[in-house]
A protein has these predicted regions:
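C-terminal motif of bacterial Sec signal peptides marking the signal peptidase cleavage site
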Residues: 18-20
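Non-catalytic cap/lid and distal C-terminal segments of serine-dependent acyl enzymes
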Residues: 27-333
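Bacterial signal peptide processing site
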Residues: 22-24
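Secretory targeting and sorting signals
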Residues: 13-15
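Bacterial N-terminal signal peptides that target proteins for export
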Residues: 1-9
Length: 333
């Protein structure tokens, strides 16, 4: 089956009525066709976290605070400033080994520390348990912040700060973290970061998802995997992914086609809960992108939903439990 025929079938299927699962449990999945000829759903239900993964593991990773120098990328002054990020290091971190790495951005009214603190440290416990059970290789997780001091009073007003964070990551935080800790980056200049992008992911919740879409738009050369949770792309304006899904899809498709990463050079693992206030925001955009099947299809984009989940931190560990083994499958070593 040729790629053109695959794309045609994919687009034809997406033109059919789509019913997503809702709080009442009714729904269906729209099938799409992958390059290998297998049926792959665009919309997927998340798998629940196994019992016991919310408990402290015998072997626990550590959290390190990093205060680093950066500058104003958002307000246009270019003035020097400092920011803070937190780094999860797996138990037994070995400076001689290479580690995959995820940068995960908090939602509004939260901080860089929130991801590792909320729900009694649920994300830390999850990472420890996933590593202990062999679901993933030991990996590093970094939680940065887009806040310049206190969060803006209106979450939507954080837009310019969310847009600025990917540049801050690439220019300032990634070089610090990945020169201090051993990832797959042989160097932390632009060339070294791009050469190691297959082992780097970025994700975020709510306004962190908006940040993730900006990273896809503006720093595709630095990350291969993208995990926007409950937030749409604002590159064409606030809530444009929801309100202008086809325009947003066309814009992002052009950005991909201008890069060397079209096809399988990236993966978007989007997610939300069926009772999440931002569910339609991100799903409408994903459906718009899926209509451009020559650029966005099951080989590089899927949507994952948790039945009944709301717009809160509580389901984040389940999204991570489902996404991380996909980004970074367990090695045979």
């Amino acid at each position: 089956m040729t790629r053109n025929l695959i794309s045609f079938i994919y687009a034809l299927l997406l033109s059919l009525p789509l019913t997503s699962c809702n709080a009442n449990g009714a729904g269906s999945e729209t099938p799409v066709i992958s390059d290998n000829g297998e049926n792959t759903p665009l919309i997927n239900e998340t798998r629940p976290i196994p019992d016991g993964y919310g408990q402290d593991a015998n072997e626990q990773g550590s959290i390190v605070r990093i205060d680093y120098d950066t500058r104003d990328y958002a307000e246009g002054t270019g003035m020097a400033r400092t920011n803070t990020a937190y780094v999860y290091l797996p138990y037994g971190y070995d400076a001689q080994k290479q580690y995959n790495i995820l940068y995960f951005v908090h939602g509004h009214y939260s901080t860089a520390a929130s991801t590792f603190e909320d729900e009694d440290g649920a994300v830390c416990k999850l990472l420890d348990q996933m590593i202990a059970h062999g679901d993933i290789d030991p990996m590093i997780v970094v939680t940065p912040s887009y806040n310049y001091g206190q969060p803006t009073s209106n979450y939507a007003d954080a837009d310019p700060y969310c847009r600025a964070l990917p540049q801050e990551l690439v220019n300032d935080l990634i070089p610090i973290v990945e020169s201090r800790y051993h990832t797959y980056a042989k160097t932390t200049d632009t060339e070294g970061i791009e050469a190691s992008r297959d082992h780097r992911a970025i994700g975020g919740f709510s306004m962190g998802a908006v940040t993730t879409w900006y990273a896809f738009d503006e720093t595709l050369n630095a990350f291969r995997y993208f995990m926007p949770v409950s937030g749409d792309c604002w590159s064409l304006g606030r809530f444009a992914g929801m309100n202008r899904p086809d325009d947003t899809a066309a814009y992002l498709a052009e950005r991909v086609q201008q890069s060397p990463y079209a096809g399988n050079g990236f993966y978007i693992w989007a997610a939300s809960g069926t009772n999440d206030s931002a569910y339609s925001e991100i799903l409408l955009q994903i459906e718009g992108m899926a209509r451009l099947a020559d650029v966005f299809n099951a080989t590089n984009m899927t949507f994952h939903q948790k039945e009944g989940a709301r717009h809160e931190f509580r389901p984040i560990p389940e999204y991570l439990y489902n996404a991380l083994p996909f980004f970074f499958p367990k090695s045979n070593e």
